[in-house]
Regions:
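Short catalytic-loop micro-motif centered on adjacent basic/acidic residues
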Residues: 37-40, 61-64, 133-136
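Short, well-ordered coil/turn elements that cap or connect secondary structure elements
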Residues: 9, 33-34, 81, 127-129
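Active-site HxH/HxHxD metal-binding segment of metal-dependent hydrolases
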Residues: 48-126
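Conserved beta-strand hairpin/beta-sheet module of binuclear metal-dependent hydrolase folds
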Residues: 2-54, 146-154
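Short Pro/Gly-enriched beta-strand edge/turn motifs at strand-loop
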Residues: 10-18, 104-107, 128-132
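Short, glycine/acidic-enriched loop or turn micro-motifs at the edges of active sites
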Residues: 43-44, 69, 92, 139, ...
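Metallo-beta-lactamase
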Residues: 131-138, 142-154
Length: 154
């Protein structure tokens, strides 16, 4: 079973994707789209639905919050499909380039992320209407990053 929902928060589109190999999904993941920026790419087990939902977006860049499969599972596919760079923290770049092992339950629930060339973000990530400042927030993972919107331009 799967979940696909779309919500809008002002200028931000939030897409919820959940996958359950048996029955209702136990958890879901959000992919955010704001003004040419995709934040996170969801789990690879939901690739068909994610690519379908985001096919008409025209991203300029993809940002990853961290390397976990449920957030990075379609980084390669979306980057390749839209011909855009994938950006993240230096640790995210290192992990996403390596042939890393994942636990069997992770592969079963989320699928495996493909290796992808993640470029390290700069001090700011700018789009036409947003200025995002990456802030390293280790805890959930050593590479976890949040993106603070510091200058919205209507």
């Amino acid at each position: 079973m799967h979940i696909v929902n779309h919500r809008q928060f002002g200028e931000i589109d939030a897409y919820e994707f959940g996958y359950g190999p048996v029955g209702r999904p136990l958890m879901s993941v959000y992919v955010y789209v704001l003004d040419g920026v995709i934040v996170d790419t969801g789990q690879s087990n939901m690739r068909k639905y994610i690519l379908e939902q985001l096919r008409d977006t025209q991203p300029e860049v993809i940002l990853l919050t961290h390397h976990h499969e449920d957030h990075s599972g379609n980084a390669f596919a979306l980057g390749d499909c839209h011909r855009v760079d994938v950006l993240g923290h230096p640790l995210t770049a290192q992990k996403m380039a390596a042939k890393r092992k994942i636990l069997p339950y992770q592969r079963y629930i989320w699928g495996k992320s493909e290796d992808v060339n993640v470029k390290v973000f700069g001090t700011l990530v700018e789009s036409a209407h947003f200025t995002l400042m990456p802030i390293h927030t280790p805890g959930h993972s050593k590479d976890h990053t949040v993106y603070l919107e510091i200058e919205f331009r209507a």
